[in-house]
Amino acid sequence: MAADAKNLIWIDLEMTGLEPEVDRILEIATLVTDQDLNILAQGPVIAIHQSDEVLAAMDDWNQQHHGASGLIERVRSSQYTEADAIAQTIDFLSLHVPKGVSPMCGNSVGQDRRFLNKYMRELEDFFHYRNIDVSTIKELVKRWDPEVMKGFKKQGTHQALLDIQESIAELQFYRDKVFKI
């Protein structure tokens, strides 16, 4: 399949916390969909090695959730660096989407973009400057038509690939129930 400018890149990061000045990326996953939100390809799911010092500095919430999911152990045993993750992810994305055309898609992608800008600038530059942020739609629906929210429940696994799949399903739900397209 040739790279298609209409395809969308979906991304999720798991991090040690919310502040890129002190926290680090633990995991990255990407998916590519067509413009109708059909999944075309799954990119590499990469746990990025971080030092024991970085992992120990995580707050209780992150320790609990990333520990329960097994991510902390995957990060400890990983041989992948941030540079490896950048290269593998760009290699994958280049097969499906030309550089600079896809918005960054996902939930709370502004947060992901902050971390990419700090630690994976070359990957952040692969995206268009625009975002398709499912969180924005969710926040509007919660305020304007809260009954609709009862129809979609997130699992909240805090595993990058599963979170992306859930973001796509959530946008499909809003497309069908809110936008009625």
UniProtKB/Swiss-Prot annotation:
CDD domains: Orn (cd06135). Its EC number is 3.1.15.-. The active site is at 129. Its main location: cytoplasm. Residues 8-171 form the Exonuclease domain. It is found in: Cytoplasm. GO terms for biological process: DNA metabolic process. Belongs to the oligoribonuclease family. This is Oligoribonuclease. It comes from Shewanella amazonensis (strain ATCC BAA-1098 / SB2B). The gene is orn.
